[in-house]
Amino acid sequence: MAESGQFRFSFCPRDATPLVRTRIDGRDRPTCPVCGFAEFMFVQIGANTVVERDGGVLLVRLNYGPRDGRWALPGGLVENDETFEEAARRETTEETGFKVALDGLLATWMRPGFPILVVIYRAHITAGTLRVAPDEASEAAFFPKDKVPPLEELAWPSTAHGLDAWRAYEPPRP
């Protein structure tokens, strides 16, 4: 059960019996009183990149769904056959045309009750030219630290968190 009290299923996926709330492992979970099916809510994993060039960070302006017109870090969900790092590189290339190398984990973000964990990597461009994926973004641009869009123009809380981590990042001293 999500923290909001909503079940993902209303009926058992095995036998179509209406699900009931049952306390399992200290949480209310949707369960089938006939076959015993119990749903455990799992977290999705997203992988984003903070791509820096000439002191600016790369953001994409989304062009779909409720976040249409808002800015986000390049990234997306991790597929079940790839690592976090592979997903971060793949999503960045798909959304921006840039191939990137990852320079390390910058931050993670998760909010209880919101079923996603986002891992955010520092990255630099190794090849490619800027081009947006028209099915995902209307534009992409580099923003200097003092010109990053304000919070209300950002698509996700994880974007704001990643940008805060980028602003605060200090490279290790040799």
Where are these regions (language model features)?
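Conserved hydrophobic "DFG−1" position in protein kinase catalytic cores
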Residues: 51-52, 59, 123, 142
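Conserved N-terminal beta-strand and adjoining loop/helix that marks the start
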Residues: 34-58, 77
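Residues immediately within or flanking Cys/His clusters that coordinate Zn2+
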Residues: 7-11, 29
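Short Cys/His-rich "knuckle" micro-motifs
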Residues: 20-27, 41-45
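Short cysteine-rich clusters marking metal-coordination/redox-active sites
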Residues: 12-15, 32-35
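Short Pro/Gly-enriched beta-strand edge/turn motifs at strand-loop
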Residues: 28-34, 104
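Unchanged
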Residues: 78-101, 105-165, 169-174
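Conserved Nudix-box catalytic region and its N-terminal flanking loop in Nudix hydrolases
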Residues: 2, 52-94
